[in-house]
Amino acid sequence: MSAKIKSGDDVIVLTGKDKGKIGKVIKVIARDAKKKVIVSGVNVHKRHTKPKAGSSGGILNKELAIDISNVATLDPKYKTPTRVGFKVIDGRKVRFAKVSGEVID
């Protein structure tokens, strides 16, 4: 089965403290029924690390995963949230934005 959101997609956050932020999907985590995504610049937390051999330690900013239902793919033409559909073009199954009909990949 094809995924509606993939790594590298531009998405907008629909709910939560980062509502309205736009970012690129870094990673899709699909474990069991809980699908999550890591989006650049969204849900950033500070991680305190101790110094070890080879690294100095300190405070690092790290993006944490958010639920896939809290993001929507951006339409490539209008830059608005859109649902994703599938259609076959020249024997290839492709994703398209339902708002504008533009092919996403």
Curated annotation (Swiss-Prot):
Gene3D superfamilies in alphabetical order: 2.30.30.30
Superkingdom, natural source: Bacteria
Family matches, as SUPFAM superfamilies: Translation proteins SH3-like domain
Annotated GO MF terms: rRNA binding; structural constituent of ribosome
Biological process, per Gene Ontology: translation
PROSITE patterns: RIBOSOMAL_L24
InterPro entries linked: KOW (IPR005824), Rib_uL2_dom2 (IPR014722), Ribosomal_uL24 (IPR003256), Ribosomal_uL24_CS (IPR005825), Ribosomal_uL24_KOW (IPR041988), Translation_prot_SH3-like_sf (IPR008991)
Subunit structure: Part of the 50S ribosomal subunit.
Biological role: One of two assembly initiator proteins, it binds directly to the 5'-end of the 23S rRNA, where it nucleates assembly of the 50S subunit. One of the proteins that surrounds the polypeptide exit tunnel on the outside of the subunit.
Entries under NCBIfam families matching the protein: rplX_bact
Protein's name according to its UniProt entry: Large ribosomal subunit protein uL24
Organism of origin: Wolbachia sp. subsp. Drosophila simulans (strain wRi)
Gene: rplX
